[in-house]
Amino acid sequence: MFARTYFGEDRHRLIAFAGGGHVYNNYEDFLGSGVPVSTEGNAHVLAARYLYRVRAPWFLGVQAVDTNYLIFGENALSGEILERIGLTGFDSVGAGLVVSYDSRDDQNSPSSGFFGDANNVAYRESLGGEADFDVYRLTLKQYFPHGRGSVLLWALSNRWTRDAPPAGYSTLNLRGYVGGQYLGENMSSFQVEDRIRMGPRWGFAVFAGVACLYGGRESCGNAKDVYWSGGGGLYYVLKQRDKMVATLEYADGEGANRGLYMRFGWGL
């Protein structure tokens, strides 16, 4: 369940999320080890963020998150691998600060403007979690209109950790890869997407991106820690007034990594 509301002439923004599920994954190359691993997991997430516009287009705010993720192998070998690398899941509760810059012309389907978001989450046992560690994120996006309703954009995403257990490491933020299959202390990705409008409601998008895991034994200077992907798909405008869209995309990563995505909203 996702909720987003603005009030006070958009001086206040409140975002909340609650979700959970049972997840099955079959990895042909788990964490780049060449070993196939089958996992099963239970997860729930509660998160909330409040932003206050201090001066257009700047926002300051706070956020909190409560996650519970339990992962276990579907067979003895998978379970032993997960135990050895410490990927068994845990409860984590944290809070942090947010600084955001938002000059986009629309929240759902921007066609121009710039978006920047820097935030941290301090996970602490004193808040009810099982580990003390920190996560820092920086996201930048810029939109350029062209043609008749088409939009070109780029996006830079970063996630850094400090003292995080393996279950709290960063995963690839790149279409075409399964979340959690490749992990590192830190992650940075850069993506470019062109959304080509074909009519009042229909259009298609093409995209490409690169990501890197680094920190510890991983480095962006090592080719094995750099990941590429590309793809494309169709989009349909469900509500023209609100610029709500549905998308169907295919992304191809390295090796056997690929994915088909159907969602409400944009993938980037």
Where are these regions (language model features)?
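Transmembrane beta-barrel strands of outer-membrane/channel proteins
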Residues: A16-F30, V62-N68, F114-A122, L138, ...
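Residues on the lipid-exposed face of transmembrane beta-strands in outer-membrane beta-barrel proteins
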Residues: M1-T5, A48-Y52, L97-Y101, L138-Q142, ...
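A short pocket-lining beta-strand/turn micro-motif at the edge of beta-sheets
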Residues: S188, P200-F204, V226-G230, Q240-A246, ...
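C-terminal soluble interaction/assembly domains
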Residues: G215-G216, G221-D225, Y236
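Gram-negative/organellar outer-membrane beta-barrel architecture
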Residues: M1-D91, G184, K243-T247, A251-L268
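C-terminal outer-membrane beta-barrel translocator/porin domains of Gram-negative envelope proteins
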Residues: R84-T88, S92-R217
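Outer-membrane beta-barrel strand-turn architecture
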Residues: Y6-R11, Y52-A56, S103-D105, P110, ...
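Flexible, surface-exposed loop regions and adjacent strand-edge segments
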Residues: L31-V37, A76-E83, V135-Y136, R159-W160, ...
